[in-house]
């Protein structure tokens, strides 16, 4: 259908509202209660427009677009009514923008400057929730904080919990001037999706403990579009990088937020992917390769350089049956590139079909029965990809990986040398206590672990090779839908840690199996050639990885549904094409090149 907005003819799908039509066309109408991922409420009243042949002003968010409709967004009566609504919204709003976590990315700030009155006429005491009865700044559950004085009662949080989460834990209580959002007996919000409440809140009423007083948007100089690898959904995300003083090296991860993808995660993500990222820069990160002194489990792990680590790896594998006797236990956190290289190594070593096992963690994640955003129980991003590449991904009736036969061969002493690749967070590979016990008992003579963290497994290892996490490398994964997605590099691996494809290239070189690759893009090109008949992988060699975008441009271009709001803030910037992609082959990454070890 066709309608006219401010003299422009717009063609939109039937069923869309006037506000949706205006947003798609880049016509500026303010809104607070409307969110593209939630139902219509029409409570904030700031989206008032004038529609020809209608006697009163209408809310654009709740008025369906009609054939031949003529809409005006800037007539004097619209401007006056809109400014009056803003004045009412700001009457009791505290002037604490300098200490509010929403500052710098707050629609209330932006719209007030653009559409609100220039000054307040309020001469009476403001309504303040403070101390007696109802408190203003309170804990709002394990992950959130609530400041009731900032709330404008848009009901986005109420609708999110009811419509998306499936458990209506938040409601508006009291009435009139005393209206407030609250939970039953002030218990706060307990949900796997609670962090999304900060995203939907258009003011600083709901904030997260994780980001509280931590940073400002302008302190995060770059943002990288990537994906979350903490479960098999593969939510599309943005990693915000915080600048450090000059004496600190590079940027650091400030927060993870969801990125809109209607086919994967819509506008949302779970709290696991949002908040459980601190291990990436935590104290347990492996910074150097480690080799245990002596040939027994009783020796101490000593730091060594990469050349010594790989030389000793080759020596100890040779002393325990040679490379043909080596077996692999691989986490389903391994990327397509890493699995492909492991397959190449296994082929070069002559490993039998039962010489490799893939493992992952499965855990219950309680959610309401009617939730619209189900968090999968599998804590791994690439189970589907591992199966596509020919690795064993059989499961038991409970969905656990079926590694029983492989486990028996290790526990019985048939396996003398085991290589464990675990690039995910602690515990994500599943139960490996049997590996630790086999090494301690001496039934397993050699344990080599490659990963980013010091865990109980790495403490039991004879050789530890430090790798990178998913935010420290360009890598491809296939989620449970069979969708190929790219995780882009946001950080550089710390210390001597290397991207895992580099480690495999040099491990192969040390063991006499040449893998002639100079970048992860080079590996992807080979995977695409070998799996060209599989529809999923046809675009693998052209898969694009986002490079860090300047923060202003990211704010301007990140959320297609609300992109124009940032144009109001950054009118002096040139237009940004939201491609944010480059050909990864144009950014060569050099592997550590070692001389062949005799």
Predicted regions and their residues:
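Fe-S ferredoxin-like electron-transfer domains
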Residues: 45-229, 233-237, 242
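Short beta-alpha connecting loops at secondary-structure transitions
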Residues: 3-4, 67-74, 181-185, 223, ...
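N-terminal leader/propeptide and maturation segments of large enzyme subunits in energy/redox metabolism
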Residues: 95-134, 493-555
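Catalytic alpha/large subunits of respiratory electron-transfer oxidoreductases
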Residues: 90, 94, 147, 154, ...
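Short aromatic-centered micro-motifs
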Residues: 3, 49-51, 328
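Short, structural beta-strand-to-alpha-helix junction motif
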Residues: 16-20, 335, 499
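N-terminal cofactor/phosphate-binding cores enriched in small/glycine residues
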Residues: 7-67, 76-81
